[in-house]
From Swiss-Prot:
SMART domains: G_patch, TUDOR, ZnF_C3H1. Residues 259-269 have a biased composition (Acidic residues). Residues 67-86, 253-282, 404-426 are annotated as: Disordered. This is Zinc finger CCCH-type with G patch domain-containing protein. Residues 310-356 form the G-patch domain. One of its GO terms (molecular function) is DNA-binding transcription repressor activity, RNA polymerase II-specific. CDD domains: Tudor_ZGPAT. It comes from Nematostella vectensis. Transcription repressor. A zinc finger (C3H1-type) spans 161-188.
Length: 508
């Protein structure tokens, strides 16, 4: 069916429901039960049609992806795919679809690594939170340049609903994009910005201490420990947000240290529910330092050295004005010889405060950020070596603290996805006609997918045998799905026939 036809059908069904609702509200007694049943059937039919519309949009998207994939394969040149010179696109396909077993093993080793990342809330509060690596991603910049290595992390102690991992996303069933979903689909972080995981310290936990406690909605709120049951390892805590008490196990508590409590009290003025996991005192102390953005090396020849990367217009202008290289500036050549350093003053500080910092020699050398980038290698061995460097960097920086994605999936109460009913085989009130209509729509969609897979397989029949094997497996998978749907269709038709025969016998 066309997308516009389905939308028009949905609008017609809604108009019919409005008309039926008007008749029911008028107070007529005759046929009231039939109208109510008709209204329920129309409501269910609207739901089925909307699902069909959604599957149609998905099939269109899959068609677009298949076209891109086929064009991606057609652009390759297998003749030039040698060990010494590999085309970028062919190497990417071969490395990531067939010969990427080592990278997949490395990905599995990285997944679940615990770390600590900086996160800025929507209201501007910057905090540090414990997290766990969910996936390793690389953002391509250019075919001839490098890939920027990033990881997608999930927060272990989310302090806001937008940070709670989406349960449907973890199951691979979420219908919303990351920005549209009210829960988190992961947070992208540069590998170089990852910090070591901070283990909760239960050695000095006592009554009256501040902590983060998990609530029924999966969010960790600011709380206070009232008492401790040492035998059962349970805590009686008081939620400050809800003003209620609860008894929680050890896994639902995250004790806050003195620095975290201090930073939390400072951030409460900006947010009602925000919790800071890093010390703002250390940040403010770091802001009171004058930094050199650039500082000369001290050699006399350093003046103008940067012009080897430019046209040297500055040196030419100075030479026209009579400047002799090696001497100082000024009329008599007694001025400064070295270039002027670039100084970045602390933001929001007065000149008197900056002068005081100069006297205290609080001058900080510029730091160079070590950017770890995933280089796209021309050979398989080179790409595996670079990927292992990123993995080694993560393991070296974060240690070997590992977690389980299953713990995130079932960690917070009420976060499990609801089990939706797909078929009521034993229910007498099941509308088998609607089920049959739904199966017909799905069969039609799968047949279209099967035709596309067969066309793609025919295009790659005379080409690389490895690509042919991939498309053959895809075709067989879609064909098996079609056979399952045909069996379901046959069973539903038998159910409808039995129901009709039973009704005829009952009337007789």
């Amino acid at each position: 069916m066309d997308e516009d036809v389905l939308k028009e059908a949905i609008e017609q069904y809604k108009q019919q429901i409005i008309q039926i609702q008007t008749v029911l509200e008028s107070g007529q007694i005759e046929g009231r039960a039939e109208l109510a049943k008709l209204k329920d059937d129309l409501t269910e039919l609207i739901q089925v049609t909307e699902e069909s519309l959604l599957s149609l949009k998905k099939s269109q998207l899959l068609q677009l992806l298949e076209q891109q994939e086929s064009s991606h394969h057609d652009s390759g040149t297998p003749e030039t795919d040698t060990k010494t010179s590999v085309d970028y696109r062919n190497s990417y396909v071969n490395d990531h679809t067939i010969d990427d077993n080592d990278d997949e093993d490395n990905d599995e080793n990285i997944i679940g690594t615990k770390c600590r990342v900086a996160f800025t809330q929507e209201w501007g509060v910057k905090e540090h939170h414990n997290a766990m690596v969910f996936k390793l991603e690389s953002i391509p910049l250019d075919e001839e340049t490098v890939d920027q290595a990033k990881v997608r992390v999930l927060f272990l102690n989310p302090t806001h609903r937008s940070m709670v991992p989406c349960p449907y996303f973890l199951e691979g069933k979420c219908k919303f994009a990351g920005a549209e979903c009210r829960f988190s689909h992961g947070y992208l972080v540069d590998v170089e910005h990852l910090k070591p995981f901070k283990e909760p310290d239960f050695s000095s936990v006592k009554a009256g201490q501040r902590c983060l406690a998990r609530y029924s909605d999966g969010v960790w709120y600011n709380s206070t420990i009232k008492s401790i049951k040492h035998e059962s390892h349970e805590f009686l805590i008081h939620y400050e947000t809800y003003n209620t008490d609860a008894t929680l196990p050890l896994d639902d508590i995250y004790p806050l240290g003195p620095e975290e409590v201090e930073s939390d009290s400072e951030s409460d003025s900006q947010s009602d529910t925000g919790d800071s996991s890093s010390s703002k005192a250390a940040i403010e102390q770091d802001d009171d330092v004058i930094r050199y953005a650039w500082k000369p090396t001290g050699a006399l020849s350093s003046l103008g050295d940067w012009e080897q990367h430019t046209k040297g217009i500055g040196s030419k202008l100075m030479a026209k004005m009579g400047y002799i290289f090696g001497k100082g500036l000024g009329k008599d050549g007694e001025g400064r010889v070295e270039p002027i350093e670039v100084v970045v003053l602390p933001q929001g500080k007065s000149l008197d405060k900056c002068a005081e910092l100069r006297e205290k020699n609080k001058l900080k050398e510029p730091f160079k950020r070590k950017k770890k980038k995933l280089v796209v290698a021309s050979t398989t061995s080179a790409s595996q070596g670079k990927a292992s460097d990123v993995f080694d960097f993560i393991n070296h920086k974060l240690g070997h603290s590992k977690g389980s994605l299953h713990d995130l999936r079932v960690s917070h109460p009420g976060a499990k996805p609801d089990i939706r009913k797909t078929r009521k085989s034993a229910d007498e009130n099941t509308n088998w006609n609607i089920q049959l209509f739904k199966i017909h729509e799905e069969i039609s969609s799968v047949k279209k997918q099967l035709n596309k897979q067969e066309e793609a397989l025919q295009r790659h029949t005379t080409r690389d045998s490895r690509n042919k094997t991939i498309f053959t497996e895809k075709r067989d998978s879609v064909h098996n799905r079609l056979q399952e749907l045909l069996k379901k269709e046959k069973k539903i038709q038998e159910k409808i026939h039995q129901k009709d025969q039973h009704r005829k016998l009952t009337v007789f």
